[in-house]
Amino acid sequence: MRRILLLAASLLLTAGVQARQTDTLFAADCGIRPYTYENLSGKFRDLLAACKEAGTRVLVLEKGRYDFWPEGAVRRDWFISNTSSEEECPSKTKTVGLLLDGMEDFVIEGNGATLMFHGKMTMVAADRCRNIVLRNLHFDFERPGGSELTYLKQDEEGVEVALHRDSRYEIVDGKIRLFGEGWQSEKIHCIEYDPDTGRFFYSDGWNVLASSPAVETAPGRVRFATPPDFRPRIGNTLTVRDIIRDQVGMFLHQSENIMLEDLGVHYMHGLGIVSQYSRDITLRRVDCMPREGSGRILASSADFLHFSGCSGKVRVLGCRFIGAQDDPINVHGTNLRAVARTGEASLQLRFMHAQSYGFDAFFPGDTVSFVKAASMQRFAAATVTSVRRLSDQVVEVVFDRPVPAGLELDRDCVENMTRTPEVEIRNCFFTRTSTRGTLVTTPRKVVIADNVYCKTGMSAILIEGDAEGWYESGPVKDVLIRNNTFIDCAWNGGPARAVIALHPSNTLVDPEHPVHENVRIIGNRFQVSGNPVLYAKSTGGLVFRDNTIETLPDALPGRDLFILEGCKDPVLETE
């Protein structure tokens, strides 16, 4: 133990001396080198702390592999939007490989290094940081949280599968059990991939296999005595993972001016890269997809990018998103329901979705809107003067003026208008997801341009705004969808199975008072399988112009291209 402490002290001293001599620090000079295959969590923890203390501007890694285990990693408690309920995962502790804590003007230059994680970990967190760049890095897990099984053959006695070499399993009491480094999969979600069609879809295949007698026929091969009526498609692959979002891929928390550039993110456990109440986030050439040569199909247990309560500008440029079990991009705020008046100018507000609660949703000085849940109309505004946390689910907020008389308790909501971003998503590629491609709800300017959406199971672009389900705010006012290509999207579901869906949660639909406004869909190319190109509800000033629509072979006949409900003054022009 004494030797370990001396080594740690030496590392800190070396790092501090080097950092004071130059703005650039080389990890190798501090004894951190690739391909040792030892646990570097503690060394990186101490090195980053030393960089902060010394004011180091650039940390440089040699190219190669660096390994991180939970032991020695930083542990922090955070409530993170859209992760786990109190019942699913009472602990909010995250185990962090690289923690940037209150750092400013700092760059990690990876030179193509691969950071390999073990167990269940949050790979990177930036907590209350400014002006941070992560560049030229790859992130992966030795044993990803997702397992992959490919149907090899079937006969009258059952089915044989091949498990991917990164998937760990054991036959226990005649049944298959999936496990990893310090964990096992119990509550399973299964998505199936068909390589012939390129489609990714919900499947009951795992439930059948897990309940069937199993025998290992060779390393990595298992035979199941499945029911006679089970007829899987040979060559398809099941991707299965635990539903509990107890960690995230990365967490950017109340930080500003963060750049992720030239990254390969090859697996994320739980949720993906979550930016929460942060400002000015840019991702440029970030590839969220399986590592080249890995032979894997899955790269995230859920979303790839999740932006909750962010502001400034969110920019996603030249990225690739391949192999998510949920939405590649989701940008939204959080509506809190008004549950009690505590004074003339104060309310108790409650988080309404079990998986989104406990985080700071309002700050003094923020402008808010009061929202009618039935119509999703913003009907009054105020400024926050103070916030008091009453519990993990309830906060008391005091405003600079009386609460509007028309507010209905236990029904209407409060939306934070300050914590809403402009959004630019450009030159990106989306495929191999069973859900949507991009979800966005913000009142500020949105540009979605020059992207390719290929075979998203549900709507390629979904604009909701709700006070009923996830309580993800709110009405959009300026959206341009231009020069994108949509290939066989929404073949499996979504609102009206439409490629682009504008679907607010309002139950009161009045064309004279639309929820969404000024959505322009211009110059795009659609290749569809007979499903609608556009579904729009309660949208004013909708423009659909100069788009090309092609029908794919084997398309379903007789479907409408457009489905409109309660829209005001739409302009629909087709070629």
Language-model-detected regions and their locations in the chain:
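Bacterial Sec-dependent N-terminal signal peptides
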Residues: M1-T22
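The right-handed parallel beta-helix/beta-solenoid scaffold, focusing on the short coil/turn
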Residues: D23, R57, V96, E104-F106, ...
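Acidic Gly/Asp/Thr-rich repetitive segments characteristic of extracellular carbohydrate-active
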Residues: A27-V60
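Extracellular beta-strand-rich solenoid/capping regions of secreted or surface-exposed proteins
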Residues: R45-A49, D67-V107, M116-R135, R143-E160, ...
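Short glycine/acidic-rich loop motifs that flank beta-strands on beta-rich extracellular proteins
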Residues: T56, F117-M123, R143-E148, Q247-G249, ...
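Ser/Thr/Gly-rich low-complexity blocks that favor extended beta-strand/coil architectures
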Residues: F117, F141-R143, L152, H164-V215, ...
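Small/polar beta-strand repeat architecture
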Residues: F200-R245, R378-A381, V387-V423, T431
